[in-house]
Amino acid sequence: GISATDQITQDKNFNLKLEGQESGSRVTYLVSTDEGKTWQETTLNQKDLADGIYLYKAVVTDAAGNTSETAVQKVVVDTTTPHSGELTLSDLNDTGVSVTDQITQDKNFNLKLEGQETGSRVTYLVSTDEGKTWQETTVVQKDLADGIYQYKAVVTDAAGNTSETAVQKVVVDTTTPQAGELTLSDLSDTGISATDQITQDKNFNLKLEGQESGSRVTYLVSTDEGKTWQETTLNQKDLADGIYLYKAVVTDAAGNTSETAVQKVVVDTTTPHSGELTLSDLNDTGVS
């Protein structure tokens, strides 16, 4: 147990031993299981004791019938596992797509145990290899590197019985995700150039490829040269003439974000000024 001298123990088998009594005297060993209210004779060998509180004393009787008693020895036999309680991650800011998955950018938080057996000793353990090995750690977790962390608490009662909490898993991820490449699917790039994205086409789709698996994608559009951005959909339909900037924001499970390169589209369905055609340098001979 926690103390090596308190005689609170898991040990159910031990012997009574008396030394220094009067030579030739008779010794009677007594035990009480009700805090000394009643006593029963017992043997030197204590074997397979049930959990409980045991008081022991020896009564020494000399040849004349005089008696004396030893001091009482108290033993608490306890083989019951203690309440382990519940381990939580106090102050953890669970960033990202889910607020309950404990995949996070947060590198600083505390371990917190509640509901464990009163008077027990708590040891906090951490594993960084998916539970193959465990090392002792502290309540305060600070400046953690990116990685997968598993935590548990081992609760030890006064008799040395132990129990463990459920494991808490935390994924610390501060790395920006792959944004991938944003393209304009089905865009018909009309006009003089087939690659300048100046077009009469008012209907096309946004398409993102190569982004981090499992990430969340938000598509944004700007119609004021990037000063402000609004969320938009994949399908761009019946656009008015104007300049459109598009980008995709990729958010991973931990809440890290990255942006694609901007795609610029100029929608122009207005007929150009035709101007006036003349015949320059024409020598208009004849009557008129």
Predicted segments with their positions:
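Asp-box/BNR beta-propeller loop motif
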Residues: 34-38, 129-133, 224-228
